[in-house]
Amino acid sequence: MRPVVRKNFLNIEELKRFLNGQTVVSIQPVTGSPLDKTDFIVAMAIAVEQAGAKALRIEGVNNVAAVSAAVTIPIIGIVKRDLPDSPIRITPFVSDVDGLANAGATVIAFDATDRTRPESRERIAQAIKNTGCFAMADCSTFEDGLWANSQGVEIVGSTLSGYVGDIEPTVPDFQLVKAFSEAGFFTMAEGRYNTPELAAKAIESGAVAVTVGSALTRLEVVTQWFNNATQAAGERKCAH
């Protein structure tokens, strides 16, 4: 496997300094959306880099390759799969890791939860190390973060907090972000950061950086937020 170009970051401390207090933009259009095309993903990536985003989270090997050729900022690469016999969706296979590395990812993120999976999380973490990319653990609990740190995973994220149970919360998990930070982890806040105020609170809670997705790049989702609010207001007005 060829050496990975990490967008000029020689070590994790350099990347941490670069991302400190910054916004990472996740560009993952709604599946089947008119925007769910590589050309549009590349266009959004260029636009948010020009607006000041310091890193991107991109799904899919082909998308990562296309975006990597178009931007200068680091990419957190993932592959999402819907498996028939496992709840693991984010980068479940070593082959996914290899594909993302060759496509130009600086960081490769994976599901670090302790659930039934096709390949062990230890094997995935080691595979990322073998590529020369930095690893990011998408966690749901503090225990996931402890495990990731014990494996030498460089970045821990609150990505999956609230997404592995039956009831999905509506607000971010600031407590988990704070716990990761207080443990000394390179912490990425992610999950339900839908306003600038929430993103700022994540930094105040100890996150190095905040990943924002739906609020910036999923037009259908944001339109629904506005529609729900205006329609509810209209119903209240009519009730009076």
UniProtKB/Swiss-Prot annotation:
Belongs to the NanE family. Converts N-acetylmannosamine-6-phosphate (ManNAc-6-P) to N-acetylglucosamine-6-phosphate (GlcNAc-6-P). NCBIfam families: PRK01130.1. The keyword Cytoplasm does not apply. Its EC number is 5.1.3.9. SUPFAM superfamilies: Ribulose-phoshate binding barrel (SSF51366). CDD domains: NanE. GO terms for molecular function: N-acylglucosamine-6-phosphate 2-epimerase activity. It catalyses: an N-acyl-D-glucosamine 6-phosphate = an N-acyl-D-mannosamine 6-phosphate. This is Putative N-acetylmannosamine-6-phosphate 2-epimerase. GO terms for cellular component: cytosol.
